[in-house]
Structure formats: structure tokens, C-alpha cells
Amino acid sequence: MLNRRQFILWTTSAILLNACSGKKKRYAKISQGSTILALGDSLTAGYGVGRGEDYPSQLTKLTDFNVINGGVSGDTSEQALARLQPLLDEHNPKLVIVSIGGNDFLRKLPESTTRQNIGQIIKRIQAKNIPVILVAIPHFTASALIGSVKEHPLYDDLAKEYDVALLKGAWAKVLGDDSMKSDMVHGNAKGYRFFAEQMADFFKQIGVIR
């Protein structure tokens, strides 16, 4: 049996371990005016809203970063991977937000392919010593029709595997709320604004803004 001193030491160690495991990934502060690349599909491009209402534009206003909209409607993870290198070369971003995968799920592409493509996206960005924020995307199933939107678990796996910050819950909240979406799979101006606010707050949580 453990004596009192051993028990206290064991309990303290367990508490500290749990506290550490719950911490968010921390990044270095990024200077105001720096360029950030938002890589993604129609949710990034701002499908369904007017000019300046997409989330990268709204995030620019909230943070004073130059957020480049690298979203293309209809893009799969494979297509985003193919576009990535020219975007990195052109913009030389200090941070990349990766929000991709929804079209893979809608088209029922193999999960292994989506996982591999997003992993390659992260690896190519990290090869340039650029920090990555991965965004969890909802897995559209029949339950989404009644407002129960859940994120695909592969994003948790990828965030752990590549040691990157993961923003969870933002798109699920938008697409689960009729007041924030223009259709089943796209936000409206209010929804994209909400996402931008969530991302700006996440910047503070992980140290990008201090």
C-alpha cells in the first residue's frame, strides 16, 4: 500500500499531468500587419455572402492581420493540397489556417485519402516553419438534418499527430444554427462573422495575439 507521502506525491503528479494534457498548443506572437493564409473551400471563400462578408475579410477587421482568402468553392482536400505551394510562395504567410474536408465528406471520398491529404498539407506548411491552425469540419450525416452537427474525429487525430492547434466547435455551431447559415452546408454573413470572432479569440488563447 502507498504511505501518506507517496499518495500525496502520486495525486499531485496526476493532477499536474491532467492539467498539462488539457492545455492548448501555444504559438509565438505574430506582429500586427502580418500576412495569414486561410486555406479552404466554400466556407472560407464565403459562398452565399457579399464581398467583405467572408470570414477572412471579417477576421482581417477584427485582428489587423492581412488575412488572405485562399478558399475555393467545391475544393476537396486533394485540390487544396495542389493549390497550396503557389499560395505559400506568393504570400509568404506567418500562419496558415487549414479548414478543408467538407467536400470530401459530402462526396463520400475515402477517409484515408482525406486524412492523408490534410496530413500532407500540414507537413508542407511545417516544412517552411510556418505554424498551422487546423479547423475541425462537421461530418455531414442524416443527423445534421435535425440540427445535430458533429465534427469528424479525424481532425483530433491529425492535430495530435502533427502537434498543431485545433479550433473545434466553430463550424459545427454555425451549421447547427438556422440563424447563422444560408443552407445546410454554408454560413451566412452572421455565421461567417461568428466564425471570425471565434478564430480571433482562439488567436488570443494560443498566443498569436497577446
Q: What feature does the model see in each segment?
A:
Residues 17, 21-23, 166-167:
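Short, motif-level signal for alpha-helix interfacial/capping segments enriched in acidic residues
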Residues 61-62, 82-210:
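Alpha-helical cap/lid subdomain in secreted, periplasmic
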